[in-house]
Design a protein with these regions (language model features):
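N-terminal-proximal low-complexity accessory segments that begin disordered
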Residues: 1-87, 462
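Activation/maturation switch segments at domain boundaries
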Residues: 2-5, 288-294, 300-301, 338-351, ...
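Short, Φ-rich (hydrophobic/aromatic) sequence segments
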Residues: 54-88, 124-132, 221-241, 356, ...
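Structured, mid-chain assembly/scaffold modules that mediate subunit interfaces
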Residues: 66-215, 412
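Short coil/turn segments at secondary-structure boundaries
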Residues: 91, 119-121, 142-145, 241-249, ...
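Short amphipathic alpha-helical coiled-coil/interface segments
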Residues: 100, 104, 308, 312, ...
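C-terminal amphipathic alpha-helical
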Residues: 117-141, 300-400, 452, 456-463
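Extended, charged amphipathic alpha-helical segments
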Residues: 206-337, 341, 381-383
Length: 463
């Protein structure tokens, strides 16, 4: 019995040891060489406290580095396209749908939607998108009057990061409700002496947060700022070194056994040694016997290109795009790889499109619709009908391989896996617009047939 109990105890203790040692995290037990670097990862910093400096650094990179600047151009073209987000109202009442869509289109003009008459709605879309990625946040202010609604884009720098008041629960220029993360007021710094507060009900604060309690956004470039700076610094250093290496061909060295302090006596012209520092094609010059030229070896860095390419890959990954899209380098790309990379990018772009529509377009349209109701340009019944039957359509993309993808869509429709509406939606085409275009095509075909018929009749009469 004792032996049996001892064996049971041993099994239990071994089980406990196995369970206790089941999880092992190397980063929590670093060696002496890596301990200082690993411990630096444990230093906690408040994202809101880093918002201002990251925004400043990201703004500098967006104009100082060509690839980062090109990335922002890519964003606007791929996410917003040629027309931005297009309103689509589908209440079942065609007259009402056209009325609202036309009224919204008129309001999008810079004279109607901007309090300063400078920016139309597409300009606001572009600036909000760039601010969201570069600054990590964008602020839209509803400027209301009795009969109109206008939108003002507030610079993130104007929301005073340095304005804090613990008693009033104000941090980084934003006042929240007591014991809550719901904002009450935003404080805008107009000048050193002028600080105004705007109710949160009149502000759309679009941001991407890391933690729920975060008041300010963090730049999308935050994780790649240091890598971009290092790569750019190395590129400039290597360029400067190459310039110096190409400018300095070599040196003149004294031969062994010849000892003198200077190249001759300054007062005696006959003792001066003439050193040739110029060269021209087809000419040769005699070199003094006491001097020997030593040429510098050519400078050809070998690891620079690899470092820059690997860094660009990491930066592109952090931005959600492929290396070839980020750099424009298509040398190592084939159809399969570029197709896979493009599909992944488009998923990212679609998420951003839907995020913008949720946070910006829907909010603005609902507020605009409310003003239409208050000014009696809509009845309550029409308001409710439109409120539940509107959407914004983002742009679609061209096919990577039209033959294969059109064939795949045709088979999917034939087998019932897809609908024509779904295929049109993927292309960013509105169904109503598509049907109208089909009707126009039918009219064109009928006219062409009439013309051809007249030609045939005329030919038959002549014969």
């Amino acid at each position: 019995m004792r032996l049996f109990r001892k064996k049971t105890k041993t099994k239990t203790s071994s089980r406990k040891s196995i369970i206790q040692n089941w999880f092992k995290f190397p980063s929590t037990e670093p060696n002496i060489l890596n301990s200082s670097e690993i411990q630096s990862l444990s230093k906690i910093s408040d994202p809101d406290s880093k918002n201002k400096i990251l925004r400043t650094q990201a703004r500098a990179l967006s104009t100082n580095t060509s690839l980062t600047n090109g990335f922002f151009e890519l964003l606007t073209s791929e996410i917003l396209g040629e027309q931005g987000m297009v309103l689509d109202v589908s209440t079942g009442n065609k007259d009402l749908d056209e009325k609202i869509e036309n009224s919204w289109f008129v309001w999008e003009n810079r004279k109607n939607c901007c309090p300063y008459g400078l920016y139309d709605f597409e300009d606001l879309e572009e600036m909000v998108l760039i601010a969201l990625y570069r600054d990590g946040e964008a602020f839209l202010h509803f400027v209301k009057s009795k009969d109109s609604l206008k939108i003002e884009l507030i610079d993130a720098d104007a929301i005073d990061n340095d304005y804090n008041n613990e008693e009033k629960n104000i941090k980084f220029g934003i006042k929240n409700e007591p014991n809550s993360i719901k904002p009450l007021e935003y404080y805008v710094r107009k000048s050193k002496q002028n600080l105004i507060s705007i109710p949160a009900s009149d502000i759309i604060h679009i941001k991407k947060t890391l933690i729920p309690q975060q008041r300010r956004g963090i730049s999308k470039l935050a994780s790649s700022i240091f890598d971009t700076y290092q790569k750019d610094s190395l590129k400039k250093a290597e360029l400067d070194r190459s310039k110096i290496s190409s400018s300095i061909t070599g040196f003149f060295v004294k031969k062994e056994g010849n000892e003198y302090d200077d190249f001759g006596d300054e007062d005696d012209d006959s003792q001066k040694i003439e050193i040739t520092d110029e060269a021209s094609v087809g000419r040769m010059k005699l070199l003094e016997a006491d001097l020997q030229p030593v040429f510098l070896p050519p400078y050809n860095p070998t690891n620079t290109e690899y470092f820059m390419k690997s860094t660009d890959r990491e930066i592109a990954r952090s931005l959600g795009i492929s290396y070839s899209t980020y750099t424009g380098d298509l040398r190592e790309v084939n159809y399969s790889s570029i197709r896979q990379g493009t599909i992944s990018e488009r998923r990212t772009f679609k998420r951003v499109q839907k995020f913008l529509i949720r946070k910006m377009h829907n909010e603005i349209f609902e507020k605009w619709l409310e003003f239409e109701l208050l000014n009696r340009r809509l009845s309550p019944q029409e308001y409710n009908l439109i409120f539940h039957n509107f959407t914004f359509k983002p742009q679609g993309w061209e096919y990577i391989d039209p033959t294969k993808e059109v064939g795949a869509n045709a088979k999917a429709i034939e087998n019932g896996f897809k609908t024509r509406t779904e295929v049109l939606r993927e292309k960013g085409i509105e169904v109503d617009t598509f049907l109208k275009d089909l009707e126009k095509d039918k009219e064109i075909i009928e006219k062409i047939n009439e013309i051809n018929k007249r030609k045939d009749d005329g030919t038959n009469q002549e014969t």
